[in-house]
Amino acid sequence: KPDVTKQVGKPWGGLGLRVDVRGFQWNNPQARDAIFWEYSIANVSDYDLRDVAFGYWVDNGIGNDNADDIGYFDAEIDMSYSWDINGVGSGGLPTGIMGFAYLESPGLAYDYQDNDGDGLTDEKRDNEPTAIIGATEGITDLSSFLEFYKLEVEDLKEHWDADEDQDWQDGEDLNGDGIYQLAEYYGDDIGIDGVGPGELNYNGPDADGSECNHMPDFVEGVGCEPNFNTTDVSESDMVGLTSFRMFPVPSHAASNETEWFKNDQVMWNLVGGDTLEEFEGNISNLVEVFASGPFPLFQGRVERISMSELHSYDPLAGLNSGTHAAPALYELKRIVQVIYEKDYRFAQPPKMPTI
């Protein structure tokens, strides 16, 4: 497709995927030990891709002392982590933990199943709001929904149909002039630029009328209001972690049987298979495979996937125990998940009052 990509002097090849990648890191005390990675994967080919998987093939080499690494996974929070079994790296320096976690894994919005166990079936992050529906409409398993989102029945409310998890908040235009004043609560109804009155870079109501229109707004590739579609990870029916493997670094030979990333069929079997296995072999130089799938990627569609690279120090006694306890790492995962779901809006001091 020369109208999409140009490879000078070479024919078009490959799957026809366009991948945008962004990495984020902050010096905020809550998140300075984590790196956020966002992937936007678009199918720009002429075909539907029925089975796709996304994952990492990693030669960890913790502490540059790679002969004694080990790792573990937790499918409930979509995280894996590895460490040096004696906690000593090159030059005798202490080593920590390196973890990978899905903050947002691929979504399966067309299989008529509740893949993430939140009581919703086939929720999406790109559907348009069409009507306000009842408090329990759209929920397939009420008890699972309440447990997953930590809600009570009385917390449920009438909501826009495309806001499946009911967290988009309308504003209160008290004087009815169609514009939120600083003294009025604007909630999430701040327009697709994502900036509300009194916030940095606010230049007035959105020209397209999406601010103060009392409905969630989203335009693909342009913007979105908070807690809706692209800014609300919970509105995806996520597959989660489906494949975790660790094995000794294989031969570099270009064999169709070697577990090496240059061998397509072998790699598909690794990342596309539903295989979650704890490594119980001899401690050595190990490769880690961490993946999610399969999922369909239809022509013209975009799949959003977000990862976090996590680092912590946890006691070796817990790591090398049967439970592989890593409390500091688990707490960091909890924190970065909240940060991601709040669209990287860290805790801030109160706004300066107007006198």
What do these predicted regions represent?
Residues 1-355:
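Extracellular/surface-associated beta-sandwich interaction domains
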